């Protein structure tokens, strides 16, 4: 997501002296970045440390502004308050349409100098560029490509069930029934709207990337109101029967811990969940299995953490470009994403340092990018503006919690999206 650079205040006189005299290279000792983000879980914090250390090695100090909440909603609330008060952070982790909203307001800086010099356009996938650029100019530095259509399975529980990874809906249900028979919670889930929507993302994608695109990216009323969408809601109702009684409000990383500890069989979550497994000392293929949600093989729904750079005074621009360059360097892209659990935001980063899940993520992204099936995630702000996303959230969560039938959910979905456009 996105962060901005700011020279630390040294006192009015000292700052004036630096601004007047110090060229780019000599300003580094006094550079500071205040970073607003929501990377607060163990795995995420470890990944963030990679970025902190990388910037510190370049003479850029770090002022942390963590705001808990995996979907970033709370962080955006804090950001709006800061900007309204005329005190925007220098760097902000952002997703998709949130970036575009700030760009439309003329609030973001210009990274064209470094992007052009380093050839970002050739190595960053086009679907990411749609958000990292505005009006033809680079405004954000993509850090990674997270994909949301993953399953994280406890290996011991899977082995007890026969060891076969499910490849379709019927096999998934059979596996969940087996987990229930084993006496563990079949699905580890946190009852928060963005988590409900993350599952729905994968369920809808399992009906094919063309249907997903029509429904969630094109917002086609026929697709949104179709019998296929009703089937998707029916499947959500079925999956709801496999969560535990205490799921409401649970944070996503606590759901990951249930799978890690063998208390649950599977979690449907983006690949940031892998960071939790690694933090707990677990190994892919030995302790847990990573696989695409059944029926979504060959397609990837993504979100991308980006650092959006807000407009700063001219003397601070070099520091901003230094940070952007550091984020996009292949060495950093590899080191950071190995820890974060995501794929690099560049397609030319070697997979050498990545584990089996990381190698699969990189290969899947390349395949989807080449096939045109690398699609923005509805649940994570890369398919629709916030108003539409939140309207979908509301319907999905109410249906998942039994407040709407599938038939009524389809009708409400069409109406809610139309009203939010």
From Swiss-Prot:
SUPFAM superfamilies: Periplasmic binding protein-like II
Sorted UniProt keywords: Periplasm, Signal, Sugar transport, Transport
Coiled-coil stretches noted in the UniProt entry, renumbered to this chain: none
Transport recorded as keyword: yes
Compartments where located: Periplasm
Keyword Signal: yes
Annotated signal peptide: 1-27
Domain of life: Bacteria
One GO CC term, this protein: periplasmic space
InterPro entries, alphabetized: Bact_solute-bd_prot1 (IPR050490), SBP (IPR006059)
One Pfam family per UniProt: SBP_bac_1
Family in the record: Belongs to the bacterial solute-binding protein 1 family.
Other facts noted in the record for this chain: Immunogenic in cattle.
Task of the protein: Part of a binding-protein-dependent transport system for a sugar.
Name of this chain's protein: Probable sugar-binding periplasmic protein
Source organism: Brucella abortus biovar 1 (strain 9-941)
């Amino acid at each position: 997501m996105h962060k901005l650079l700011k020279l630390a205040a040294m006192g009015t006189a000292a700052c004036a002296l630096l601004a007047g005299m110090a060229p780019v290279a000599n300003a580094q000792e006094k550079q500071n970045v205040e970073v607003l983000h929501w990377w607060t879980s163990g795995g995420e914090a470890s990944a963030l440390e990679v970025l902190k250390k990388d910037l510190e090695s370049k003479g850029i100090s770090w002022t942390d502004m963590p705001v808990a909440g995996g979907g970033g909603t709370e962080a955006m609330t804090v950001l709006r308050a800061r900007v309204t008060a005329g005190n925007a952070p220098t760097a902000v982790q952002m997703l998709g349409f949130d970036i575009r909203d700030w760009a439309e307001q003329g609030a973001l800086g210009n990274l064209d100098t470094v992007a052009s010099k380093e050839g970002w356009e050739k190595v960053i996938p086009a679907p990411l560029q749609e958000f990292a650029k505005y009006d033809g100019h680079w405004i954000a530095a993509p850090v990674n490509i997270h994909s949301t259509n993953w399953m994280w399975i406890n290996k011991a529980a899977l082995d007890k069930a026969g060891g076969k990874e499910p490849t379709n809906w019927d096999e998934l249900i059979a596996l969940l029934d087996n987990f229930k028979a084993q006496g563990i919670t079949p699905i580890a889930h946190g009852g928060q709207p963005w988590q409900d929507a993350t599952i729905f993302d994968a369920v809808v994608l399992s009906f094919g990337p063309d249907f997903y695109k029509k429904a969630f990216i094109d917002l086609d009323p026929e697709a949104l109101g179709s019998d296929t969408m009703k089937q998707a809601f029916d499947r959500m109702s079925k999956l709801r029967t496999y969560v535990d009684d205490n799921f409401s409000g649970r944070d996503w990383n606590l759901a990951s811990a249930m799978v890690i500890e063998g208390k649950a069989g599977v979690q449907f979550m983006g690949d940031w969940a892998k960071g939790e497994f690694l933090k707990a000392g677990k190994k892919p293929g030995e302790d847990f299995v990573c696989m695409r949600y059944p029926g979504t093989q060959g397609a990837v729904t993504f979100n991308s953490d980006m650092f959006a750079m807000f407009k700063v005074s001219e003397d601070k621009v070099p520091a901003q470009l230094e940070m952007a360059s550091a984020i996009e360097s292949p060495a950093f892209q590899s080191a950071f994403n190995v820890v974060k659990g995501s794929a690099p935001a560049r397609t030319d980063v070697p997979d050498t340092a990545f584990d089996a899940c990381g190698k699969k993520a990189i290969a899947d992204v390349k395949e989807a990018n080449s096939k045109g099936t690398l699609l923005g995630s509805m649940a994570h702000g890369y398919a629709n503006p916030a108003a539409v996303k939140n309207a979908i959230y509301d319907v999905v969560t109410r249906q998942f919690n039994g407040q709407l039938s599938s038939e009524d959910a389809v009708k409400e979905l069409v109406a809610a999206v139309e009203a939010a456009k």
